[in-house]
Amino acid sequence: MEELGAAASGAGGGGGGGEEHGGGRSNKRGAGNRAANEEETRNKPKLRDRITSFRKSATKREKPVIQHSIDYQTAVVEIPPALIVHDDRSLILSEKEVLDLFEKMMEDMNLNEEKKAPLRKKDFSIKREMVVQYISATSKSIVGSKVLGGLKNSKHEFTLSSQEYVHELRSGISDEKLLNCLESLRVSLTSHPVSWVNNFGYEGLGVLLDVLEKLLDKKQQENIDKKNQYKVIQCLKAFMNNKFGLQRILGDERSLLLLARAIDPKQQNMMTEIVKILSAICIVGEENILDKLLGGITAAAELNNRERFSPIVEGLENNEALHLQVACMQFINALVTSPYDLDFRIHLRNEFLRCGLKAMLPTLKEIENEGLDIQLRVFEENKEDDLSELSHRLNDIRAEMDDINEVYHLLYNMLKDTAAEPYLLSILQHFLLIRNDYYIRPQYYKIIEECVSQIVLHCSGMDPDFKYRQRIDFDFTHLLDACVNKAKVEENEQKAMEFSKKFDEEFTARQEAQAELQKRDEKIKELETEIQQLRGQGVPSAIPGPPPPPPLPGAGPCPPPPPPPPPPPPLPGVVPPPPPPLPGMPGIPPPPPPPLSGVPPPPPPPGGVFPLLSGPIELPYGMKQKKLYKPDIPMKRINWSKIEPKELSENCVWLKLKEEKYENADLFAKLALTFPSQMKGQRNTEAAEENRSGPPKKKVKELRILDTKTAQNLSIFLGSYRMPYEEIKNIILEVNEEMLSEALIQNLVKYLPDQNALRELAQLKSEYDDLCEPEQFGVVMSTVKMLRPRLTSILFKLTFEEHVNNIKPSIIAVTLACEELKKSESFKRLLELILLVGNYMNSGSRNAQSLGFKINFLCKIKDTKSADQKSTLLHFLAEICDEKYRDILKFPDELEHVESAGKVSAQILKSNLVAMEQSILHLEKNIKNFPPAESHHDKFVEKMMSFTQNAREQYDKLSTMHSNMLKLYESLGEYFIFDPNTVNMEEFFGDLNTFRTLFLEALKENHKRKEMEEKSRRAKLAKEKAEQEKLERQKKKKQLIDINKEGDETGVMDNLLEALQSGAAFRDRRKRIPRNPDNRRPPLERSRSRHNGAMSSK
């Protein structure tokens, strides 16, 4: 074993067995270090590893004995006799050591078990000779690198070690030296074993890519630079001719980009090598390699400001380089057939055709070349398969997708007389607006095509190269779904609103007609009773006619009892002053009483404020006293409610405000100009004008009759309307509804002085000019007879229609809801299903065998959780109905008015009707007791008589409809077994509406859950399918790698290129989506004609 160490180290030292092949004479340093040899002898396993890591550096004159493309079963026979080593070193090794080294040698050769088996069967002597020859060859490789130390000449007599190549390339050599180094490296990568390539690849790949990038970035490229680029590409191709190199290339982000940048149609040979490499990467690359490849091609195109596939098409145009045309077609086929998505394949193919391939196809078909014919046939066959698959997707629409006329007619026929047709027309019209410019117009269409492709291809995988552009990053799927759903919802809602409106109108008319009919029936019965009474008294039959009808108030049923204590405020006129506004009618709330905002009086305003602020006030939380401003002229006052210091809190916003920073003279000047208390002209008038305006100002403050608060409120009212007092009086007398408004009458009722004050003001009519404005207004209004009853009656008239419109829909909603509940068969079936499920679940309990249940239980169904706490009994019922009893699902639509009925309060409805009747009675009484008119403007009685009659009729109808509604609700109590007096309408219908809403939500959640489960199931199937396809692809890749005869796995690129050239790489990539033979559609009948690269279809 020591001699084995010496023999192995003799390859690097001067030991006794180093004569053969001159291997032992190259290392002088090891000859004088016996201690090191002894250390290596003690660590023989490590030494064996070192031995098997050596590689032979091949020269042009002496090829390596073990080639990677030969048959290893005949390796020993093909070894030249001169290289068979016969020395004593082979006799020193034991049989176990020889076998161990033999296994190491085969592993170094990257042989699989299938290739190792025949070699293991060889005779032991042959194995020993192979091991000794292998040791000698690796020793010679070290001698060549250490002794000669580099490249001796351009003939490449000697080569460098892998690390020396890395160092040489990093040293910055250029031109001829770089070319010689790269050529030597190419030979070494081609001839050395895989382990040498591995040692070089860890650092060498990055150095090679740096060299290529540096060469590509040079602005002035000489001929030698182009040669060096070509040599780098050749080195990369040789480096990739094994699995390790291929994986390293695919793992480096720069490699694909630099390869794409190096594509140059002017350098035919280099471009041929590059597109071959890229073609091989397309068909054997790992996951997402297509994304990286397209990204690199797109980025390179953007750097050169060109279409990304234009260089490939330019390569096809070079008729003088047939090998380049074949390689470009190989790349097109490899790239277009790689995606597993039909839309993406069509998108890539169309992009090539758009770049000029379509116009070139006829010319290429005329070239007689077997390799080119294979690639063209593959292109057409895959194109036909994709079009066939697209036709199946479009229900066998037979059309020629490459002909613009055919595509337009196909699209037009699809959209004709549909909702999408106007949008197509709008799109085409917008196309006509594109500028008619030779250069700009194609760019418009390019942008439009990119946007359309992103929208259309988004759901099935966006073209990955778009991430290198200004991408439209929108999820148009949800947008389109939302638009479609919104359009459907809007259309259905519009129809539903129209039908609902018509139905409500018809139902309201029916209810009113029934009420009128019921009223007339009662009248008939009353008259018949009276006739019977008269006949019983013996009155002769010749009665002049029926007695006159009873007075109007007594025509209807007896008035209901007075309202209960808690009812809302009644209509105006029912309660003595001050009357509240009508229920539901938003009166203008009284603002906080401000000081009189009329003409400012001479005394300093506001009186009584300054004395309060005379002393210093200590402000809380460290606040400082606000600055006191002194304007040059009197300013208008802002009527705000002041915050007192005691109202401040520590976190209030007022502590943080610093308004002083906005102080400036321009602001104050503008304020003085805009908001003075009097105009300039008034200030500049002479004493005569002052004397005229002065006395009244002093008398404004002198209230004779009214108190300050009442005067202030009246001032606010008069300032809001700014109408002459006589005009206000006349529109009230005339009951001029065009000028009157609800707010005006409400404010008058609210702020007008009481009758005693008005009577006193009437006595001051002679002193009218000396009175303040509120009292002047009081004097004018005091002349109107029965002013407050008149105002309350007018207010009732103005708000009557609004109250009718509030009461009538509530009655109709409850009436409809009662009828719907009784008529709904689907709701009955649902109750049946719930009763069944409940009795089953309650088996063995006191609630078992129930005959029914309280209707309020429906809202509690959701409280029963499932065992896994993920669902409820309500979800279960909704699912059962959805799957087996779909007719039950109609009940939410059949109970349409339950929601509106649940918002009706029976107490408020009754009180509103009572208030309406009381208002009508008061109005009738006022009309009866109204004094004769003293002015031609007074038309109160005239207008109120007709209104009273109409109001009475409307009320009678509403009262009858309300009575019918109560009867229906009482019958509903009997129907569902509940006490109508205990369970009010709002509670009953509210519970039903809540259950209806919860049921619909449960149904929606079930659908959503099923969709999620279906998505998960499809995702799982898709994942399994993807895994299966991945395994199949890996199997196909392995088949592609092993497609040649027996040999090691170092010829990966050679095998892939051969598969591409022969078309075998594309055979299993077609027809990715198998169809069921039973459901297969009949084949498309196409008549094909070759014209300009397009196929016509009939």
From Swiss-Prot:
Q: Which GO terms describe its molecular function?
A: actin binding; small GTPase binding
Spans of biased composition, class Basic and acidic residues?
36-52, 1007-1032, 1075-1087
Checking SMART domains in the record gives: Drf_FH3, Drf_GBD, FH2
InterPro entries given in the database record? ARM-like (IPR011989), ARM-type_fold (IPR016024), DAD_dom (IPR014767), DIA_GBD_sf (IPR044933), FH2_Formin (IPR015425), FH2_Formin_sf (IPR042201), FH3_dom (IPR010472), Formin_Homology_Diaphanous_sf (IPR051412)
- Output the superkingdom of the source species: Eukaryota
Could you confirm whether the keyword ATP-binding appears in this record?
Answer: no
> Pfam families per the record?
Drf_FH3, Drf_GBD, FH2
N-acetylmethionine is found on M1
- Sections of the chain in a coiled coil: 375-416, 490-539, 999-1050
Q: Which Gene3D superfamilies match?
A: 1.20.58.630, 6.10.30.30, Formin, diaphanous GTPase-binding domain, Formin, FH2 domain, Formin, FH3 diaphanous domain, Leucine-rich Repeat Variant
Keywords (alphabetical) are: Acetylation, Coiled coil, Developmental protein, Differentiation, Oogenesis, Repeat
The keyword Repeat is annotated on this UniProt entry: yes
> Where is this chain compositionally biased, Pro residues type?
543-565, 578-608
Question: In what residue span(s) does the FH2 domain sit?
Answer: 625-1025
| Known role | May be involved in oogenesis.
Q: What is known of its domains?
A: The DAD domain regulates activation via by an autoinhibitory interaction with the GBD/FH3 domain. This autoinhibition is released upon competitive binding of an activated GTPase. The release of DAD allows the FH2 domain to then nucleate and elongate nonbranched actin filaments.
Q: How does it assemble?
A: Interacts with MAPRE1 and APC.
PANTHER family assigned to the protein according to its UniProt record, in alphabetical order: PROTEIN DIAPHANOUS, PROTEIN DIAPHANOUS HOMOLOG 2
Name recorded for this polypeptide:
Protein diaphanous homolog 2
Specify the species. Mus musculus (Mouse)
